[in-house]
Design a protein with these regions (language model features):
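RNA pseudouridine synthases
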Residues: 1-180, 184-210, 283, 290
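Accessory RNA 3′-end/elbow-binding domains used by RNA modification enzymes
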Residues: 1-11, 17-34, 38, 42-43, ...
Length: 322
C-alpha cells in the first residue's frame, strides 16, 4: 500500500479540498488529507498525506509557515484580499517608504491578530465567511500569533495613482492570516490594505524545492516515503533490534537521553523512532524513565499503522493559515 507525503505546488483558483480530490484519484485511495488550508487565490506548498502518512499531518499543521506576498496599500476589501470588493480607498501616494518599514516592524514578533472576517473560523457553529455572505455581522476575537520574519523586498509605486504595492516575505506561526497582516499594515498607515498575491514557500521542513505541480504528479506520483518525511519533521531516535520488537507491539522501552529536560519527546511533540534498517517504527513520547509509543507504524503481527494501546491516533488534519 502506497503511503507517504506529497508536496504539491497548489495552483491558483483551486481549493485545498480540490487538490485532495485530485490526489485521491492519482493515488487510487480515499485516505488522503492535507496539513493546512491555502485560500483559492494562493499558490504554493500544500502538504498532502496518503494512507498511513495521514497520521503525520497532525504534527505538520502546527509547524511554522513561510510565504511571499504582495500587499496593496490604499484599498481595503471585504475579504482582505483581491477576491473581495473594494469597500474603502484612501490614497497611499504620500506614505513614505520609511513609514512602511516601520509599520512592518510593528507587526513583527509576538502579536495579537484578529483573523479575517471571511475565514473558516466558526462563530456560533457557523463559518465566519458564511455569516458575512448572508449579511450578518462578524466580530472575531484577537488571538496570539508569532511573526518570526516580516521582510520588505520591494516597494512599487509604478502602478501610479493612489496605490502602493509592497512585496514581502513572511515567516510565521501556524494559524496566522497573511490577509490580516495586509489589512493591519494598511490600517496602521491610515490608508487600508489588502493582499493581491500569496505564495507559500515552506511548511515546516518541506519547501517549494520538493513540490510538484498537479500536472507533474499526473505523469509521475512523487511521494516522500514515511521514514524520510518523519526524519525531516521531528527529532529522531535509532532503535536496537530488541527495542524495535518491543515498540512494534506497543510496549514501552527505556526513555531517550533527553528525558526530563526541555528536549524530551512529548505526546504533542514526539520523536520518530527508526528500526536498524532505517524504517519508521513509531512516534515516541518520554514519560519518566520510559518512552512509550504514541503511534505505531511497524510491520509485523498486526501492529502496522495502529495506535499504541490507550492512545488515540491523530486523524487527518486541516488548518487555516492563509
Amino acid at each position: 500500500m502506497l503511503s507517504g507525503l506529497v508536496i504539491v505546488d497548489k495552483p491558483q483558483g483551486w481549493t485545498s479540498h480540490d487538490v485532495v480530490g485530485r490526489m485521491r484519484r492519482l493515488a487510487g485511495t480515499r485516505k488522503v488529507g492535507h496539513a493546512g488550508t491555502l485560500d483559492p487565490m494562493a499558490t504554493g506548498v500544500l502538504v498532502v498525506g496518503i494512507n498511513k502518512a495521514t497520521r503525520l499531518l497532525t504534527y505538520i499543521v502546527g509547524t511554522s509557515k513561510t510565504y511571499t506576498a504582495t500587499i496593496r496599500l490604499g484599498q481595503s476589501t471585504i475579504t482582505d484580499d483581491a477576491e473581495g470588493d473594494v469597500i474603502a480607498a484612501v490614497s497611499a501616494a504620500a506614505v513614505a517608504d520609511e513609514a512602511i518599514h516601520d509599520g512592518v516592524a510593528a507587526l513583527t514578533g509576538e502579536i495579537q491578530q484578529v483573523p479575517s472576517s471571511v475565514s473558516a473560523i466558526k462563530v456560533n457553529g457557523e463559518r465566519a465567511y458564511a455569516r458575512v455572505r448572508s449579511g450578518k455581522e462578524v466580530k472575531l476575537a484577537a488571538r496570539p500569533v508569532a511573526i518570526h520574519r516580516f521582510e520588505v523586498h520591494r516597494i512599487n509605486r509604478e502602478a501610479g495613482g493612489d496605490v502602493v504595492d509592497v512585496d514581502v516575505t513572511v515567516e510565521c506561526s501556524s494559524g496566522t492570516y497573511i490577509r490580516a497582516l495586509a489589512r493591519d499594515l494598511g490600517d496602521g498607515l491610515g490608508v487600508g490594505g489588502h493582499l493581491t498575491a500569496l505564495r507559500r514557500t515552506h511548511v515546516g521542513p518541506y519547501s517549494l524545492d520538493q513540490a510538484r505541480t498537479l500536472e507533474q504528479l499526473a505523469e509521475e506520483l512523487n511521494v516522500l516515503e514515511m521514514s524520510q518525511a518523519a526524519r525531516a519533521l521531528m527529532p529522531n531516535r535509532e532503535l536496537t533490534a530488541e527495542e524495535t520488537t518491543e515498540i512494534s507491539f506497543g510496549r514501552r522501552i527505556a526513555a531517550g537521553a533527553e528525558a526530563g529536560d526541555p528536549a524530551a519527546a512529548t505526546t504533542e511533540h514526539p520523536a520518530a523512532a527508526f528500526a536498524p534498517d532505517g524504517s519508521l517504527v513509531a512516534l515516541l513520547a518520554d514519560s519518566g524513565n520510559f518512552a512509550k509509543p504514541v503511534l505505531v507504524f511497524a510491520p509485523g503481527n498486526g501492529a502496522s499503522g495502529n495506535s499504541a494501546p490507550g492512545n488515540a491516533a491523530p486523524g487527518t488534519a486541516a488548518g487555516g493559515d492563509a
